[in-house]
UniProtKB/Swiss-Prot annotation:
Homotetramer. It comes from the Eukaryota. A carbohydrate binds at N14, G98, L99, Y100, D208, R228. Belongs to the leguminous lectin family. It comes from Canavalia cathartica. This is Concanavalin-A.
Length: 237
């Protein structure tokens, strides 16, 4: 199975797999059962921003999800990613719908990682920024139902021609270049990621959510991972 570390924006409470009974943000280490969660007032039809940071000195992965009205949720978890992830990874965004549905629209996405080496005193950095997504976005690997170009956005899950979200859909977008996320001789390894999103649903219960994830470089969508598995995990263990 793939090795996945993710920050989930989970719109639907699947209490049978340990979710709290409300929409939440969570940190997932190799399992959809979050290590840590925080209550999130998801605003249907409003653009929100997610900001994720990590550095190897504090060994803490943190995320803040906020809306223009100042409403925000924060979650953090202490983890040494050297012990969890391979040295080279890919970063991506994933989303799913199930019985209930929502649009999982990404309007922008940026990422920066830095690796400061002891031996050479050099800093290796990787940076990308998408302020919009074109039809033929060559530097993204699209998986499942993900498409780009509609209004300059990235649609992670299926949307009908009139803009209505579809159920039982899963899609992911990964940056094409592998990221050197850690190195044994590095003094500091750090990264931060930001994306803006729009979740819109005609249902009283939108589902299922969006995640920023880091994985082994050959990661693909596990079969049967629509709905509560967010396109990331093969099962709910």
């Amino acid at each position: 199975a793939d090795t996945i570390v993710a920050v989930e924006l989970d719109t639907y409470p699947n209490t049978d797999i340990g979710d709290p009974s409300y929409p939440h943000i969570g940190i997932d280490i190799k399992s959809v059962r979050s290590k840590k969660t925080a209550k999130w007032n998801m605003q249907n039809g409003k653009v929100g921003t997610a900001h994720i940071i990590y550095n190897s000195v504090g060994k803490r992965l943190s995320a803040v999800v906020s809306y223009p009205n100042g409403d925000s949720a924060t979650v953090s978890y202490d983890v040494d990613l050297d012990n969890v992830l391979p040295e080279w990874v890919r970063v991506g965004l994933s989303a799913s719908t199930g019985l209930y549905k929502e649009t999982n629209t990404i309007l922008s996405w940026s990422f920066t990682s830095k690796l400061k080496s002891n031996s050479t005193h050099e800093t290796n950095a990787l940076h990308f920024m998408f302020n919009q997504f074109s039809k033929d976005q060559k530097d993204l690997i699209l998986q499942g139902d993900a498409t780009t170009g509609t209004d300059g956005n990235l649609e992670l899950t299926r949307v009908s021609s009139n803009g209505s979200p579809q159920g039982n859909s899963v899609g992911r977008a990964l940056f094409y270049a592998p990221v050197h996320i850690w190195e044994s001789s590095a003094v500091v390894a750090s990264f931060d990621a930001t994306f803006t999103f729009l979740i819109k649903s005609p249902d009283s219960h939108p589902a299922d959510g969006i995640a920023f994830f880091i994985s082994n470089i050959d990661s693909s969508i596990p079969s049967g991972s629509t709905g509560r598995l967010l396109g990331l995990f093969p099962d709910a263990n």
